[in-house]
Amino acid sequence: MFSSLRLAISFLTIFPFYNKMADNKELAQSVSYYPLVGFLLGSIAAGVCYAMHSIGLNLAADVLGLVTIITLTGGLHQDGLMDTADGIFSGRELHRKLEIMKDSRVGAMGVIALATVLLLKIAFLFELDLAQKLTAFIMAPMAGRWAMVLAITRYPYARATGGLGACLKQAGKTQLALATLILVAGCLWLFGLPGLALLGIVFFITWLTVEFIVKRLGGMTGDTYGALGEMIETWVIFLILLGQQIRML
């Protein structure tokens, strides 16, 4: 377990906790712990946000919390979001979309997608009470990384030749089940039983989002895993805000 967790942390963050070359089987087993990595990242971000709030900062605290996660992950998922947007919204045929996504240059749609996601996250976080804000910082990365596990284990890989994401395709139902258990436990700890309603909506939105991507690309890639995570994080923060406004969470 701890070996797989260290590998998951090393794979998804800038922390080199796994000091040897992992094979595909080890990478696949580590997928189970992606939501736990999200919990750790979110806890650090929540701590930064709380510290900034304690000295009187509000909007800056929200932004610094988000910047903390981006920094700790090396901007990996934001890069995937931009590449995915450039490819999907290019209006080209399938093979050209995949080529565009591999291009290191960023297009207009990628910039627009990243700006939109960041602005939405900041706006939603700013409207939250401090307690809900801190739970959102923890819950959103957990759910985003669970969504990646769902896509990895249940949907085909889009490219004919393997990329970084293809190394994870040995992951299956066992990894998804454990990742789901971690997510459910975390949600119940943060929200109690009302959190189950939140999870149900998150599961449905995740399914819709993955289906949207697969329909346009023929499968998933490493970039789309990151894009999916970013989109689900944004949805989770919004849903927590909605739950606050209707006094459900």
Curated annotation (Swiss-Prot):
It comes from the Bacteria. It is a multi-pass membrane protein. Its main location: membrane. Its EC number is 2.7.8.26. It is an enzyme of class 2 (transferase). One of its GO terms (biological process) is cobalamin biosynthetic process. It is found in: Cell membrane. GO terms for molecular function: adenosylcobinamide-GDP ribazoletransferase activity; cobalamin 5'-phosphate synthase activity. Pathway: Cofactor biosynthesis; adenosylcobalamin biosynthesis; adenosylcobalamin from cob(II)yrinate a,c-diamide: step 7/7. Pfam families: CobS. The keyword DNA damage does not apply. Its cofactor is Mg(2+). Belongs to the CobS family. Joins adenosylcobinamide-GDP and alpha-ribazole to generate adenosylcobalamin (Ado-cobalamin). Also synthesizes adenosylcobalamin 5'-phosphate from adenosylcobinamide-GDP and alpha-ribazole 5'-phosphate. This is Adenosylcobinamide-GDP ribazoletransferase. It comes from Desulforamulus reducens (strain ATCC BAA-1160 / DSM 100696 / MI-1). The gene is cobS.
